[in-house]
Curated annotation (Swiss-Prot):
Name of this chain's protein: Transcription antitermination protein NusB
Keyword Transcription among UniProt keywords: yes
Gene3D superfamilies tied to this protein: NusB-like
Gene Ontology CC entries for this record: cytosol
Family the UniProt entry places it in: Belongs to the NusB family.
């Protein structure tokens, strides 16, 4: 796991805790923000594991609930009757064969109208019963499929959450490194110092949106990306955009990644028209 990626994540978690009014934060206050961000990651790990365990338990419960439906579907028996669906279909087929024979005899001129009507009625009843049985079977199978689909989805979610949780110990270990915390502090300090200019820059490339109406997570991700791309100039545009998109995938809603990607690419395209001031201070020697 890359140190700078962890630093970006810490900074994102710390942005939400920045005071709205303080003009300048002390280094101690910023350090406290990062410690709070690390604690948030630890809590997220426990929550992720708990959620995964709950999803696995629900999957197991659903599988047990599906057992009676599977048995009912395999039996495919009518309420109050012992004949299987196959027997009922065979019965209907025999009635139809008898009816066909009677019709042939009728064409020969020797027919009994009452017998024809009775055979037709019997065939109709048999087919109706078979149709109802098929409908009941289809309903049971649909219920089983729905349950199994939910089990698969829950299992997939649990696997994904476990994958995230397994990466957390490494992330938490790297987050304690001095170089990681130093870069996260650098991002937070630059964001706090240049917040108004950053917001104006972003508003200039938003199409049909007001920055204040953008979701908090997406807005903070965009701000940190501008810090890297146009204030610290510590990462190439492509790297900063890709990293911002990854943060949006992890912390934003399903549309967040595409939104962040589009805004930042428009920002790069507009740079020749509205260049941002270069910060003369070095960005450090961390590599993305």
């Amino acid at each position: 796991m890359q140190p700078r990626r962890v630093a970006r994540e810490l900074a994102l978690l710390g942005v939400n805790q920045l005071p709205a009014t303080a003009a300048k934060l002390s280094e101690k206050q910023l350090e406290d923000l990062l410690l709070a961000a690390i604690r948030a990651l630890q809590e997220e790990t426990h929550e992720t594991l708990s959620t995964a365990a709950a999803e696995i338990q629900r999957s197991d419960r659903l599988l047990h609930e599906s057992d009676p439906l599977l048995l009912a579907a395999s039996d495919a028996k009518e309420e109050g009757g012992a004949r299987s669906l196959t027997v009922r279909l065979q019965q209907a087929q025999r009635h139809l064969q008898r009816l066909e024979t009677a019709l042939k005899e009728a064409n020969a001129g020797d027919t009994v109208q009452g017998e024809l009507l009775e055979l037709a009625h019997q065939a109709q009843v048999a087919l109706s019963n078979a149709g109802q049985a098929l409908e009941h079977l289809e309903q049971r199978l649909y219920s089983v499929r729905r349950i199994l689909d939910e089990v698969v989805q829950l299992s997939q979610k649990a696997v994904n959450r476990l994958g995230v949780a397994l990466s957390m110990p490494e992330l938490l270990h790297i987050a304690q490194a001095q170089e990681v915390r130093a870069y996260a502090l650098q991002l937070l300090t630059a964001l706090r110092t240049h917040k108004e200019a950053i917001d104006a820059r972003l508003q200039g490339v938003l199409v049909g949106w007001q920055l204040k109406r953008v979701g908090r997570i997406e807005r903070d991700i965009l701000r940190l990306a501008v810090v890297e791309m146009e204030i610290l100039r510590s990462s190439p545009d492509k790297v900063a955009i890709n990293e911002a998109v990854e943060l949006a995938k992890k912390y934003g809603d399903p549309e967040a990644a595409a939104f962040v990607n589009g805004v930042l690419r428009r920002l790069v395209d507009s740079r020749m028209e509205a260049p941002f001031g270069r910060n003369p201070s070095p960005a450090g020697d961390l590599r993305s």
